[in-house]
């Protein structure tokens, strides 16, 4: 009991000492030193370097008087090792004082060093300094650690400490110390404790170190950094199973090595050599997944490998089989001057410096295309050879890395994403070179973003990759063909991408023209609203719809400005309408009404749209207008003018009644123009001539710009009318129906039937239309009669004779004022028409089929004869006159 109590008492102070701070330990050291000075040193050398046994908690019963009585004897037995003061002496005092009194000599670092020197041979356990904790770890008995053997002194050292060891012990050596970053060196060596079965005892560790030193004692001290680079790249994922193979010719010999590598000291060869050696290493590894991160540098292509000028040069060479790779490298690494010139394969332009033909590929970017085309001696034309060369390169790419083409597929359609993710694990286990991952990652984004703007080098790729359909892509994880083609073009496209060839040759890194793109992403619960666009909630649906509509409207509006003559004339007409309204004198009230009438001429299409804006004005002219004209022609004079102009413009090539009606309402003008342009072309031949003429006249009344636009339309319509024998139509149909809306060409047929009822107050417009018809636009036989009726204005019999076919002889219906205004405007129009129709006298007659009358068609704006708009009519007359004057210029 006494010995046990004494041990317990001694254990408690040790525990307290461990808990005490550094200051307490220092004080204890000082006190212990004083005690040692007072007492003679113990006869035997102390082995305090052994860590004390784990302390035991003191029990209250152990501290009784019995323990105190036997403590002296216990100290006597243990005194040789630990001269600890008796707890009785320290009764009532804090344990810190007892710790100071019972300072353990082995605690001091200096004493430890001395004891190591004296008893290093006999030590069982090595004491470790706290300063060395980063080197040895927190718990060396259980930590995994790695050792290297110094070839100078055969000492086993941890890699983290190797540099300092070399500097300390062998700094006098002529060779410079080999600096090894701890992380990279650490990866060289598998844990010895694990490889030896995970033993935790120090003796086992030292013995394993001995094995290491024995196996690598013949190794040289220093390895070239390149050798070390390869070590780092290829030996990272080491496994204890392969311990038996320990290579001998290296300084930092890893305890485990996967495969022996014969490094080439040549800088360029080193990088390329890593390519072939990697595949074997990786395939033999148990955990190939670790490989990719461990080989960042070796994947960099050597300059020779980039000779082909491909955007992503390295992948083809690195991804080939080792044998193939070595052969390819030999060819690529040949200097340009050493190649044998072949005009069918090489650029062939004579180099001014060397006086020899250039031996770069046909896609050489040093010499211009014209220079390369001028080279003599090719078996085929240069362009043919270039196309063949590109095709061959693409085929090679397809054969070389079909796997790397697959990843792009999922990128285009996320549904295949699961196959893609499952694919990646496959690739590594099957020995795919880690270096592959880089090239093929770099090339991934390009194929899957055909919708994105591509760099100038990729137009051909875009054309090739865009057609690929996403469905085949995700049908199976490995469809090589669809996906491979774009990717192969990425790396082999040498047409447009070759401008970068020169700069690429100087780069030692892969690059991509796009921002990084995810290989795949989760689309669970999402809706696809476009290629690559997925929506995960519906909160923004309304906003998205509104935005889409706005964009569509904007694009459609812009479209009209860019469309060729037909649409352009339509738009000018609409613009002119406001001008005429403003400028038409009061005497030309009829002119403004004409616009309304024109609006009604396209009643079939426009009736609904036009009626709403201009319905108010109809009642004033209701008596003059037929029932239909009342509805559609009731529109305001301005609107009617616009509609008239639109109808005339639409009539030029393809504007049917629908087109003419569009202008009636400002909102509807653009859509009508679109419709008219579409419809006009099909029916131009038959009835367009009349419509075109009307449109041209009305547009001429408007701004000069409109006149220009209308002139092409008029010409077109006139030609179509002549072809369709518009002259016959114009004479009969116009006189019978007085088609108010001569503008719509295909409606012209309809106008003939409906024009009689359509006659409206727009006498002036009718007169203008009649003139247009005379100029060679026969009355529109095919246009809807209802629209013509609405557009037509009451015109005198004389007016109707004027190729105002759309306007039926309803002059009697029209009020006297409107009739007078019409005649007034008609006279100047006739004069103007005569001027314009210098070349075609037949234009005066309704039957004129020539295109010149079309220009006269601009006059129709004057046709608005509705009495209500007398105020606006004066301006309209002025516009009519001006338009007539300008029409000759507008002729195409």
Swiss-Prot record:
Name of the gene this protein is made from: ATXN7
Protein name: Ataxin-7
Post-translation changes: Proteolytically cleaved by caspase-7 (CASP7). The cleavage may be involved in SCA7 degeneration: the isoform fragments may exert distinct toxic influences that could contribute to selective neurodegeneration. Sumoylation decreases the aggregation propensity and cellular toxicity of forms with an expanded poly-Gln region but has no effect on subcellular location or interaction with components of the STAGA complex.
Stretches for region Disordered: 1-74, 195-247, 298-328, 389-505, 616-730, 818-892
InterPro entries per UniProt: Ataxin-7-like_regulator (IPR052237), SCA7_dom (IPR013243)
GO biological process: microtubule cytoskeleton organization; negative regulation of microtubule depolymerization; nucleus organization; positive regulation of DNA-templated transcription; regulation of DNA repair; regulation of RNA splicing; regulation of transcription by RNA polymerase II; visual perception
Organism lineage string: Eukaryota, Metazoa, Chordata, Craniata, Vertebrata
Glycyl lysine isopeptide (Lys-Gly) (interchain with G-Cter in SUMO2) cross-link, chain position(s): 257
Cellular compartments per GO CC: cytosol; microtubule cytoskeleton; nuclear matrix; nucleolus; nucleoplasm; nucleus; SAGA complex; transcription factor TFTC complex
Organism: Homo sapiens (Human)
Role noted for this protein: Acts as a component of the SAGA (aka STAGA) transcription coactivator-HAT complex. Mediates the interaction of SAGA complex with the CRX and is involved in CRX-dependent gene activation. Probably involved in tethering the deubiquitination module within the SAGA complex. Necessary for microtubule cytoskeleton stabilization. Involved in neurodegeneration.
């Amino acid at each position: 009991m006494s010995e046990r109590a004494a041990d317990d008492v001694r254990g408690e102070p040790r525990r307290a000492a461990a808990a005490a701070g550094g200051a307490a330990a220092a004080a204890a050291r000082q006190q212990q030193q004083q005690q040692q000075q007072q007492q003679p040193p113990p006869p035997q050398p102390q082995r305090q370097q052994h860590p004390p046994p784990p302390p035991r908690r003191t029990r209250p019963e152990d501290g009784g008087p019995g323990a105190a009585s036997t403590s002296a004897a216990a100290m006597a037995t243990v005194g040789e090792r630990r001269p600890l003061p008796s707890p009785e002496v320290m009764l009532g005092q804090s344990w810190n004082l007892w710790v100071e009194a019972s300072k353990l000599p082995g605690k001091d670092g200096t004493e430890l060093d001395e004891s190591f020197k004296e008893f290093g041979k006999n030590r069982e356990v090595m004491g470790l300094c706290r300063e060395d904790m980063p080197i040895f770890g927190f718990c060396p008995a259980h930590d995994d650690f790695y050792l290297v053997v110094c070839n100078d002194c055969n000492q086993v050292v941890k890699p983290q400490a190797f540099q300092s060891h070399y500097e300390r012990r062998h700094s006098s050596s002529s060779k410079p110390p080999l600096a090894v970053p701890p992380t990279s060196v650490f990866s060289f060596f598998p844990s010895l404790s694990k490889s030896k079965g995970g033993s935790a005892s120090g003796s086992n560790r030292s013995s394993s170190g001995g094995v290491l030193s024995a196996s690598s004692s013949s190794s040289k001290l220093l390895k070239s950094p390149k050798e070390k680079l390869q070590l780092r790249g290829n030996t990272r994922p080491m496994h204890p199973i392969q311990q038996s193979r320990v290579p001998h010719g290296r300084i930092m010999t890893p305890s485990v090595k996967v495969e022996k590598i014969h490094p080439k000291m040549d800088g360029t060869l080193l990088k390329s050599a890593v390519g072939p050696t990697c595949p074997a290493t990786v395939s033999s590894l148990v955990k190939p997944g670790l490989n990719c991160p461990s080989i960042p540098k070796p994947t960099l292509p050597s300059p020779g490998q980039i000779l082909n000028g491909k955007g992503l040069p390295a992948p083809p060479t690195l991804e080939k089989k080792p044998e193939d790779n070595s052969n390819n490298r030999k060819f690529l690494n040949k200097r340009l001057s050493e190649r044998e010139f072949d005009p069918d394969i090489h650029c062939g332009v004579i180099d001014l410096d060397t006086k020899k033909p250039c031996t770069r590929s046909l896609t050489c970017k040093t010499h211009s295309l014209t220079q390369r085309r001028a080279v003599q001696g090719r078996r085929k034309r240069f362009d043919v050879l270039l196309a063949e060369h590109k095709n061959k390169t693409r085929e090679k790419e397809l054969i070389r890395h079909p796997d790397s083409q697959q990843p792009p597929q999922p990128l285009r359609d996320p549904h295949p994403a699961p196959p893609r993710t499952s694919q990646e694990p496959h690739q590594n286990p099957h020995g795919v070179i880690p270096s592959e991952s880089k090239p093929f990652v770099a090339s991934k984004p390009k194929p899957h973003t055909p919708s994105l703007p591509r760099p100038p080098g990729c137009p051909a790729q875009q054309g090739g990759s865009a057609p690929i359909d996403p469905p085949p892509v995700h049908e199976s994880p490995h469809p090589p063909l669809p996906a491979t083609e774009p990717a192969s073009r990425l790396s082999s496209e040498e047409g447009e991408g070759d401008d970068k060839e020169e700069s690429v040759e100087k780069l030692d890194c892969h690059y991509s023209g796009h921002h990084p793109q995810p290989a795949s992403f989760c689309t669970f619960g999402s809706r696809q609203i476009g290629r690559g666009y997925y929506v995960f909630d519906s909160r923004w649906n309304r906003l998205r719809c509104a935005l889409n509509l706005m964009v569509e409207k904007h694009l459609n509006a812009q479209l009209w400005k860019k469309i060729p003559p037909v649409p352009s004339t339509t738009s000018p007409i609409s613009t002119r309408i406001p001008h005429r309204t403003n400028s038409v004198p009061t005497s030309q009230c009829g002119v403004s009404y004409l616009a309304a009438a024109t609006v009604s001429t396209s009643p079939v299409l426009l009736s609904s749209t036009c009626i709403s804006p201009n319905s108010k004005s109809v009642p004033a002219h209701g008596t003059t207008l037929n029932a239909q004209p009342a509805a559609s022609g009731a529109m305001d004079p301005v609107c009617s003018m616009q509609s008239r102009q639109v109808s005339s413009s639409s009539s030029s090539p393809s504007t049917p009644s629908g087109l003419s009606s569009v202008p009636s309402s400002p909102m509807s003008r653009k859509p009508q123009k679109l419709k008219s342009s579409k419809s006009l072309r099909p029916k131009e031949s038959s009835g367009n001539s009349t419509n075109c003429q009307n449109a041209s006249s009305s547009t001429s009344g408007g701004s000069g710009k409109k006149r220009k636009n209308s002139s092409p339309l008029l010409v077109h319509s006139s030609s179509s009318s002549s072809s369709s024998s518009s002259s016959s139509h114009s004479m009969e149909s116009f006189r019978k129906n007085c088609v108010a809306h001569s503008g719509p060409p295909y409606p012209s047929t309809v106008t003939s039937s409906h024009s009689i009822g359509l006659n409206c107050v727009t006498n002036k417009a009718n007169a203008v239309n009649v003139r247009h018809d005379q100029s060679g636009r026969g009355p529109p036989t095919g246009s809807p009669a209802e629209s013509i009726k609405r557009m037509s204005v009451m015109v005198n019999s004389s007016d109707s004779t004027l190729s105002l076919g759309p306007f039926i002889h309803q002059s009697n219906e029209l009020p006297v004022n409107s009739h007078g205004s019409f005649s007034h405007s008609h006279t100047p129009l006739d004069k103007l028409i005569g001027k314009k129709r210098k070349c075609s006298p037949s234009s005066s007659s309704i039957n004129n089929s020539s295109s010149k009358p079309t220009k006269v068609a601009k006059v129709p704006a004057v046709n608005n004869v509705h009495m209500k708009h007398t105020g606006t009519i004066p301006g309209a007359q002025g516009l009519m006159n001006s338009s007539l004057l300008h029409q000759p210029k507008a002729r195409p």
